[in-house]
From Swiss-Prot:
Gene Ontology molecular function, alphabetical: RNA binding; RNA-directed RNA polymerase activity
The name this protein goes by in its record: Phosphoprotein
Coiled-coil residues: 310-339
Family of this protein: Belongs to the morbillivirus P protein family.
Residues covered by region (Multimerization): 304-376
Modified residues (Phosphoserine): 151
Gene: P/V
Entry domain remark: The N-terminus consists of a long intrinsically disordered tail. The central part contains the coiled-coil multimerization domain (PMD). Forms a four-stranded coiled coil structure. The C-terminus constitutes the alpha-helical domain that binds to the nucleocapsid (N-RNA complex).
Description of post-translational modifications: Phosphorylation on serines by host CK2 is necessary for the formation of viral factories.
Described function: Essential cofactor of the RNA polymerase L that plays a central role in the transcription and replication by forming the polymerase complex with RNA polymerase L and recruiting L to the genomic N-RNA template for RNA synthesis. Also plays a central role in the encapsidation of nascent RNA chains by forming the encapsidation complex with the nucleocapsid protein N (N-P complex). Acts as a chaperone for newly synthesized free N protein, so-called N0, allowing encapsidation of nascent RNA chains during replication.
Organism: Canine distemper virus (strain Onderstepoort) (CDV)
Annotated segments matching region Disordered: 31-86, 123-172, 242-307
Assembly and interaction partners: Homotetramer. Interacts (via multimerization domain) with polymerase L; this interaction forms the polymerase L-P complex. Interacts (via N-terminus) with N0 (via Ncore); this interaction allows P to chaperon N0 to avoid N polymerization before encapsidation. Interacts (via C-terminus) with N-RNA template; this interaction positions the polymerase on the template for both transcription and replication.
UniProt entry keywords in alphabetical sequence: Coiled coil, Phosphoprotein, Viral RNA replication
Length: 507
């Protein structure tokens, strides 16, 4: 803490030296001072408020008075707007009697102490530096006069009104000719000192001026006519201050800086957001604690109704979309169930096919050991049925025992044929099949698998009608031919009709 105090003191000394060497233009100083007076002293017109602030400042000063000697040790608030911290430094100054307080010709920095009471080293120039200061007016140290009896006044009173310079902290209720820390001088005191130094004849160097930063705007609150009730002996309901809302835009007004002193350690308030000057109203305020809302215009009502209609239509669209998605999901689930059923049926079909393959392989094994007798094979050449055409695709299948089936179908068994060698029959002669085992000769005049021979019989006419129906002829022609078929009599006429139908269907 001592290093910070020494740093601020050295910076203040450098600033004052620069001002003494390069004084600013008097016209610019007067212009800045007039602007500062207009913005920072609106509360001086109210005498009651000024007196109340003086009494409060005096109460604070008297609460810090020592019990010994005429020296006064107090806290000088140091405001650092950049980091939001408040530093205090112990000040030792001579305090003359209250009735003999007069503004001195200047302010002299004599000694600087830290919080532990030790003197700060390394600032020897502060003892010899004298800064001229004129009459400051109703600024700085003149604002602290009052009586000790006023300190019992209610502490809940609002001290944020009046002079804007009070927002920078409390000032002492005396008019000393010494100051403990040069860097603690307020902007108003610097302006007054520079104006006084200009009046005493300090020359100005061309092209070098001093620019003062603007004091942040402080919006004055509207005091209620009926103050809030103070503490009573019984519990009661408080209805608030009844403050009328000054802005309906929804922006939070910047709070006035507290003027009360604090003996507790300072706390950093970094990353504090700046107050919003204007913001869009987001919700309707409730008529509570005396807050009044402005009447709604017709345009606002129409915009709200349009907004409600658009919101309702959007909700309906979202609902319909959700319904459509639900239906699609239901259809997909139904198809999935169908696929599961088809999968089960496919598995059963595969099992049946495997069973049929096993049965077919079994039949093929049996067929390999069976001999199929072909009609006409082994017949005598003199037999009239021996000239029947044989299907060339049919071949005799011989089993494992090639001699056994032949001996069973021949006219004479093999045993009898082998014993009769003297009869002139050799073993290599062609055997004859038994007549009972021979097929009857095929009648070429009757219908068979070889060909169709129409006759005036019901089965023959039924076969012919089936041929007509299965043909690709128009329906009208089919009806005509079926009608003619019913009226035809005789084998010859039926044969001619058959030839005609064959020519029409194969055309």
């Amino acid at each position: 803490m001592a290093e910070e105090q020494a740093y601020h003191v050295s910076k203040g000394l450098e600033c004052l030296k620069a001002l003494r060497e390069n004084p600013p233009d008097i016209e610019e100083i007067q212009e800045v001072s007039s602007l500062r007076d207009q913005t920072c002293n609106p509360g001086q017109e109210n005498g009651t408020t000024g007196m109340q602030e003086e009494e409060d400042s005096q109460n604070l000063d008297e609460s810090h008075e020592p019990t010994k000697g005429s020296n006064y040790v107090g806290h000088v608030p140091q405001n650092n707007p950049g980091c939001g911290e408040r530093n205090t430094a112990l000040v030792e100054a001579e305090r003359p009697p209250r009735e003999d307080i007069q503004p001195g010709p200047g302010i002299r920095c004599d000694h600087v102490y830290d919080h532990s009471g030790e003197e700060v080293k390394g600032i020897e120039d502060a003892d010899s530096l004298v800064v001229p200061a004129g009459t400051v007016g109703n600024r700085g140290f003149e604002r602290g006069e009052g009586s000790l009896d006023d300190s019992t006044e209610d502490s809940g009173e609002d001290y944020s009104e009046g002079n804007a310079s009070s927002n920078w902290g409390y000032s002492f209720g005396l008019k000393p000719d010494r100051a403990a820390d040069v860097s603690m001088l307020m902007e108003e005191e610097l302006s007054a000192l520079l104006r006084t130094s200009r009046n005493v004849g300090i020359q100005k160097r061309d092209g070098k001026t001093l620019q003062f930063p603007h004091n942040p705007e402080v919006r004055q609150g509207i005091r209620s006519v009926d103050p809030l009730k103070r503490g009573t002996e019984e519990r009661s309901v408080s209805h608030g201050m009844g403050i009328v809302a000054g802005s309906t835009s929804g922006a939070t007004q910047s709070a006035l800086k507290s003027t009360g002193g604090s003996s507790e350690p300072s706390v950093s308030a970094g990353n504090v957001r700046q107050p919003a000057m204007n913001a869009k109203m987001t919700q309707k305020c409730k008529l509570e604690s005396g807050t009044q809302l402005p009447p709604r215009t017709s345009n606002e009502a129409e915009s709200d109704s349009e907004y409600d209609d658009e919101l309702f239509s959007e909700i309906q669209e979202i609902r319909s979309a959700i319904t459509k998605l639900t239906e699609d999901n239901q259809a997909i689930l139904t198809k999935l169930d169908t696929l599961l059923l088809l999968k089960g049926e496919t598995d059963s079909i595969k099992k049946q096919i495997s069973k049929q393959n096993i049965a077919i392989s079994t039949i093929e094994g049996h067929l390999s050991s069976i001999m199929i007798a072909i009609p006409g094979f082994g017949k005598d050449t003199g037999d009239p049925t021996a000239n029947v055409d044989i299907n060339p695709e049919l071949r005799p299948i011989i089993g494992r025992d090639s001699g056994r089936p032949l001996a069973e179908v021949l006219k004479q068994p093999a045993s009898s044929r082998g014993n009769r060698k003297d009869s002139g029959i050799t073993l290599g002669s062609k055997g004859q099949l038994l007549r009972d085992l021979q097929l009857k000769p095929i009648d070429k005049e009757s219908s068979s698998a070889i060909g169709y021979k129409p006759k005036d019989t019901a089965p023959s006419k039924a076969v012919l009608a089936s041929l007509i129906r299965s043909s690709r002829v128009d329906q009208s022609h089919k009806h005509n031919m079926l009608a003619l078929l019913k009226n035809i009599k005789g084998d010859d006429n039926l044969n001619e009709f058959y030839q005609m139908v064959k020519s029409i269907t194969h055309a």
